[in-house]
């Protein structure tokens, strides 16, 4: 396997979880990962200190990047995607820093080189083989409903609107089709719609997902209304919508500093 694979961990106020996330990068996983970057989005807790301490004492092959301003989750993705392109990576794996996803769930994809057949391998929390722990019934059924609605609009089977464990071919990221997408939590939803609009070869893969001590930034009613608006705009004119400026604040360059 000669591909360069980047592991990208977005982080914001994850002091309780980030060490557990970094501990997921065991020997079996490291066999497939070329480089690891943690992109901190101006955390106001001790997240940065936790990562620095981990790098000093346990793993020196991790880089900590700190955004020059809070770009939100979508903006951190743009930082990492740009890093992957500039440094000639072939693939980038996204693992959220809040310890809800399990990186080992993607080991079969890596071992069997399944990822080579696809532009995107998306972790799916709501497939038959998926495992959910501590997830409320209302959120589960809400996701089922929206997966169904997205399936109707895209005319493809959708199993997840955006989990925190995904893998992308850097080849499709080079033209920055995602740059105008929202820097907010809706970034992943736009990435999904874009995959259908640009006819990316896409795989949903069952993963495990847990909620323990994480703090959700997702306000369900507001989020649901925004998703419905997104679907309406996509259905009305997919080309116009997917190429439109969706950001509240236009940023020409998403800058970050490498701390260590």
Which residues make up each language-model segment?
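Acceptor/aglycone-binding surface of glycosyltransferases and processive sugar-polymer synthases
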Residues: 67-86, 91, 103-185, 212-222, ...
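Short beta-strand/loop segment that forms part of the nucleotide-sugar
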Residues: 33-43, 65-66
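Acidic helix N-cap motif at the loop->helix transition within catalytic regions
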Residues: 19, 45-54
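Hydrophobic helical membrane-anchoring modules
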Residues: 1-2, 155, 179-260
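Cell-envelope/extracellular polymer assembly enzymes that use nucleotide-activated donors
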Residues: 4-6, 35, 190
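Short, well-formed alpha-helical segments that are part of the catalytic scaffolds
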Residues: 14-29
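A conserved acidic beta->alpha catalytic loop
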Residues: 40-49, 99
């Amino acid at each position: 396997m000669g591909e360069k694979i980047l592991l990208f961990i977005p982080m914001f106020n994850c002091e309780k979880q980030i060490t557990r996330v970094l501990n997921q990068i065991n020997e079996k996983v490291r066999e497939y990962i070329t480089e690891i970057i943690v992109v901190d989005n101006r955390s106001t807790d001790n997240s940065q200190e936790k990562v620095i301490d981990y790098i000093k004492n346990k793993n020196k092959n991790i880089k900590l990047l700190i955004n020059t301003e809070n770009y939100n989750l979508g903006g951190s993705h743009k930082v990492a995607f740009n890093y992957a392109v500039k440094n000639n990576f072939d693939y980038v794996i996204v693992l959220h820093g809040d310890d809800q996803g399990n990186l080992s769930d993607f080991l079969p994809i890596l071992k069997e080189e399944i990822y080579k057949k696809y532009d995107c391998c998306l972790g799916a929390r709501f497939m038959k083989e998926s495992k959910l722990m501590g997830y409320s019934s209302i959120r589960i059924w809400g996701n089922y409903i929206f997966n169904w609605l997205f399936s109707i609009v895209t005319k493809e089977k959708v199993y997840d609107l955006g989990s925190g464990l995904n893998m992308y071919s850097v080849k499709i990221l080079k033209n920055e089709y995602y740059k105008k997408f929202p820097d907010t939590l809706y970034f992943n939803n736009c990435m999904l719609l874009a995959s259908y609009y640009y006819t990316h070869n896409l795989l949903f893969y069952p993963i495990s997902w847990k909620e323990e001590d994480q703090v959700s930034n997702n306000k369900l009613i507001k989020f649901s209304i925004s998703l419905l608006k997104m679907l309406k705009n996509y259905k009305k004119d997919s080309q116009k919508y997917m190429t439109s400026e969706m950001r509240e604040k236009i940023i020409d360059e998403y800058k970050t500093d490498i701390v260590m």
